[in-house]
């Protein structure tokens, strides 16, 4: 009998846990639950004898993998997987997967919550502006980016996108204007929404030079990863350009410095993009099915390491 650990410092909803357990019960697996843990030692102990693991934002590094002597697969319930040490997973012969698309609508809806809040001057009682007819640039046209484009059309916005790995014809087929570079996207957009993963290529790539291309009154919204922002350069630019706004659901390392730009900066207390009941259930159950598919049939469709 396979043993599966659900390790979530930030727990799934009860409905999601019930659904995950039902998938594993049907497969004849044992399910172990570790929620709201406060010490890494608790995780190290829990992984010692499991065959598979589901995580959310929990970090799986070499130390965790060393402790997981029987682990064959770890699935991140969500799209981003920078919390898994992929090289270490490969070295330990552990398959790492994500569940792309399961949180996409949830994140996309939050983008517009943040944008309406910013456009209405953070609800301070003064007159704001509408989203209608504004130019929205989407950086990365994956599952979240496509949902953002879909919702933007409901606001009657002009939608542009750039994705180095998505053909222009795919973007255009979705009724979105494809541009040739990130620089062009910033130059041609009133608002840019970030949906790039945190990789060696993208870390700190959102820098002063790029953001400064936004026109007067530009807004940068980040529901991707904080690591893609060059915080020092963005802080300097916000000080220089009083017309820019930055809204995010990922608290920056330099949050106290950003907070000085009252009326132009907002962050949620915690990452909120996937924090809906629907996304919670979708991602968790998808992760469970992927584990069963891998252990029973060797399916590696969403594997992110080599």
Language-model-detected regions and their locations in the chain:
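C-terminal helix-to-coil terminal segments
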Residues: 3, 8, 15-18, 23-26, ...
